[in-house]
Amino acid sequence: MSRVYNFSAGPAAIPEEVLFTVRDELLDWHGIGMSIAEVSHRGEEFIGVAEEAERDLRELLAVPESYHILFLQGGSRLQFAMVPMNLLANHKKAVYIDSGVWSNLAIREAKNYCDPHLATNAKELNYTGIPDQATWDMPNEAAYFYYVDNETVNGIEFPFIPDTDLTLVCDMSSNLLSRPFDVSRYGLIFACAQKNMGLAGLTIVIVHDDLLKRSPLPTTPSYLQYALHAKERSFINTPPTFAWYLAGLIFKWVKNQGGVAVLAERNQRKAAKLYKFIDKSNFFDNPINPTYRSRMNVIFRLADERLNSLFLKEATENGLANLKGHRLLGGMRASIYNAMTEEGVDALINFMGQFEKRHG
């Protein structure tokens, strides 16, 4: 069986080396006669897996000891509510940036708990970039400052960390582990796993200890309180054990690749060559301001959108899967997360070039 190049936005491609390990260990994990999916979450086997995964992630991202790393059930959308529930405390206001689909959904959810103050709105630029930081409307006081580092639907990525004295909260669901960054600049970071860390159903939260002291809103269920999850080391109930195990394997894979910095260089090369091809083409187009182009999700359109179905059909026939754009924007989207190889991007560029010659 030959595997295709999977450009899905999520659930996304998983490194083949990791899949081979899962295959080899699935029936009999480390000689115990059981799958890791079958063992007790409180048994020594899984506790060892969980602790090693946390150590590896802390090492990869240089997470200070003053932060807890939580492995939680649910997707990132649950965090849209958990963040204000846990961090508002006595504040009535929180600051948000509207940079695209996912930040907009977070803002809508936050309205159930507070008055979200928009520092800036990329809608002014038709979501093709971020307004200059000098123009942002920044209040002196607010519970936190929230932004999405990479908008998977819109193809926008922040090339910088926003400059603010407020507690910085960031959704890094689609680019965590794709480049180094200074964790200490943030109060809280969260990321669902199905982009760069494995399976849907697991979300990783990195939260500063000081924020765990904030009193959650009175209506916050105990299960949605960060402090309780931290106290119980993410074992309030049965966690998503297999997803946690797989994330741990991916952390090992990242280390074996040379670490996050090595992957960052590779990701930059992949994105640069794809954007270079699109920019030179008279048939394909990317509307995003080059400064804010995502390294993870490359959106593009065909000059003749009547050819969209044919493009997708022929791409699939050539082993290039899941290139259809998000239903809200249409067009095409190539998601080139950590697991996507440079060979995969080269194959896509070659196919796009051949398609343009035939139909351009």
From Swiss-Prot:
Catalytic activity: O-phospho-L-serine + 2-oxoglutarate = 3-phosphooxypyruvate + L-glutamate; 4-(phosphooxy)-L-threonine + 2-oxoglutarate = (R)-3-hydroxy-2-oxo-4-phosphooxybutanoate + L-glutamate
SUPFAM superfamilies: PLP-dependent transferases
Annotated keywords: Amino-acid biosynthesis, Aminotransferase, Cytoplasm, Pyridoxal phosphate, Pyridoxine biosynthesis, Serine biosynthesis, Transferase
Subcellular location, record wording: Cytoplasm
Pfam families noted in UniProt: Aminotran_5
EC number assigned by the record: 2.6.1.52
Biological-process GO terms, alphabetical: L-serine biosynthetic process; pyridoxine biosynthetic process
Pathway the protein takes part in: Amino-acid biosynthesis; L-serine biosynthesis; L-serine from 3-phospho-D-glycerate: step 2/3; Cofactor biosynthesis; pyridoxine 5'-phosphate biosynthesis; pyridoxine 5'-phosphate from D-erythrose 4-phosphate: step 3/5
GO molecular-function term, one example from the UniProt record: O-phospho-L-serine:2-oxoglutarate aminotransferase activity
Stated name of the protein: Phosphoserine aminotransferase
Organism: Coxiella burnetii (strain CbuG_Q212)
Lineage of origin: Bacteria, Pseudomonadati, Pseudomonadota, Gammaproteobacteria, Legionellales
